[in-house]
């Protein structure tokens, strides 16, 4: 899958839960955690903690473990052990659960990381971790020396051991389901019963994986995204070595293409879907969103419904730009997250230098098909993935493609007209409250143990 952002292995999708009834209030955005390296997946665990995957910032390339990026003018993607899994505990502590996990990112910016991508818990409380690759999977074990990338694992939190359940990257190498170029980058996954449904944005596929150790059971490719070539816009890239802030970046770049909607361009493009996000719909089907291919045409991304048994794919919505998250609220309304509202190349130079507006949007699609922008810009930037909190707000990985400045944010959609950004809380007690509430809602028999004090903490957000 050429020239597309495989490293948007973005976030865990919806954690099912009932909204806690509260009086309507202005929509607000709160920063719950900051200073992260390419944050992606979030999930509430059975212990009441909020778990967060950090894809990491890759390596410095000194050991030669680098490959050319298929999505960033072939700038080097270098491997390192900078990925991690962290959690915020019910008493407010930030802890590292797993560290020194393999990571792959642009060098030297650390942008567009691939590594620990998504996290989920099954109904029994077992943890599962998905890792991305962001490149040709045949280089994973040899050049990069990162055999753990491109796989779905079961995690033993007691021993910190990982048990491989599926090698998505190897499957792409051996099968290349969509018949296009050989690329794998598992983005996100959803669990239904004893089955995991894995979205691979590089391979353009959805895979059905048994959590019982039975492996990959079925793989289906998403339909090609056809766009009128005359409507495509292309960037004018500087020659190799002239990327601002990246003068010492090794490796080449393609010749600068022309600009404008009808310009002749030298970038190879393929019409592909690039799926990024998945969640369970109220009717028991799966809902999947796509990012789109380079040059990331605006207002072209689609949303699909997928039958969990047959993996039959049907388009249910379109007209979006670079989607990286989907979720449903308790009333059955669908929410879609736009990573950046304009084609990403207009706002971020190849190599990871932000030069423009990387604002994204959270869009509500009502059951009747009507659309409403719940939040746009104003702190929502290059975001990915949506986790529904028990009170009906959304947990999102913000600046999810950037090193050092990644965040976990909460958007409360109660009254979208106000669009109010609130300061970062002095503590993570609100986040802890979400975690505790999620745990109780997972185990309905314990709901009566939720205290008024905990609910008050949620209100303070």
Question: What positions do the PLM features span?
Answer:
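A short, hydrophobic C-terminal helix/tail in secreted or cell-surface proteins
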Residues: 421-441
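C-terminal membrane-anchoring or membrane-association module
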Residues: 437-461
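Short loop/turn segments that connect beta-strands within beta-propeller blades
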Residues: 89-93, 156-160, 210-214, 307-311, ...
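Short, conserved, GDST-rich strand-edge loop motifs in beta-rich repeat architectures
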Residues: 53-82, 129-150, 230-251, 266, ...
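A short loop-to-beta-strand structural motif that recurs across blades of beta-propeller domains
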Residues: 81-86, 150-153, 205-207, 302-304, ...
């Amino acid at each position: 899958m050429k020239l597309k952002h495989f490293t948007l292995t973005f976030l865990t999708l919806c954690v099912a839960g009932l909204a806690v009834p509260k009086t309507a209030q202005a929509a607000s955005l709160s920063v719950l955690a900051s200073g992260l390296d390419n944050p992606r997946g979030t999930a509430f665990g059975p212990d009441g903690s909020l778990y967060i995957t950090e894809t990491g910032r890759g390596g410095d390339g000194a050991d030669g473990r680098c490959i050319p990026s298929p999505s960033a003018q072939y700038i080097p993607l270098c491997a390192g052990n900078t990925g991690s899994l962290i959690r915020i505990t019910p008493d407010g502590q930030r802890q590292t659960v797993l560290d020194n996990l393999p990571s792959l990112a642009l060098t030297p910016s650390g942008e567009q990381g691939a590594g620990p991508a998504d996290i989920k818990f099954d109904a029994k409380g077992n943890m599962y971790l998905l890792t991305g690759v962001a490149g040709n999977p045949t280089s994973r074990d040899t050049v990069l020396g990162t055999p753990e990338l491109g796989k779905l694992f079961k995690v033993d939190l007691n021993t910190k051991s990982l048990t491989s359940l599926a090698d998505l990257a190897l499957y792409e190498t051996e099968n290349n389901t969509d018949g296009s170029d050989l690329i794998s980058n598992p983005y996100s996954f959803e669990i239904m019963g004893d089955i995991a449904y894995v979205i691979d944005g590089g391979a353009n596929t959805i895979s059905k994986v048994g959590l019982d150790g039975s492996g990959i059971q079925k793989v289906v490719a998403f339909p090609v995204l056809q766009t009128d070539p005359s409507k495509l816009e292309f960037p004018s890239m500087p020659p190799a070595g002239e990327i601002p802030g990246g003068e010492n970046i090794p490796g080449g770049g393609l010749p600068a293409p022309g600009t404008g909607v009808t310009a002749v361009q030298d970038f190879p493009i393929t019409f592909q879907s690039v799926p990024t996000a998945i969640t369970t719909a109220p009717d028991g089907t799966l809902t999947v969103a796509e990012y789109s291919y380079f040059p990331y045409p605006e207002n072209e991304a689609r949303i699909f419904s997928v039958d969990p048994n047959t993996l039959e794919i049907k388009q249910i919505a379109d007209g979006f730009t670079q989607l990286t998250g989907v979720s449903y609220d308790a009333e059955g309304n669908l929410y879609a997250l736009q990573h950046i509202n304009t084609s990403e190349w207009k706002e971020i130079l190849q190599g990871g230098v932000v030069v423009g507006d990387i604002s994204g949007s959270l869009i509500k699609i009502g059951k009747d098909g009507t659309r409403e922008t719940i939040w746009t810009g104003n702190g929502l930037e290059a975001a990915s993935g949506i986790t529904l909190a028990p009170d009906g707000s959304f947990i999102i990985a913000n600046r999810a493609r950037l090193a050092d400045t990644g965040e976990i944010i909460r958007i409360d959609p109660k009254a979208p007209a106000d669009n109010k950004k609130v300061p970062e809380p002095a503590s993570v007690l609100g986040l802890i409250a979400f975690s505790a509430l999620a745990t109780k809602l997972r185990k309905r028999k314990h709901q009566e143990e939720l205290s008024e004090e905990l609910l008050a903490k949620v209100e303070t957000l």
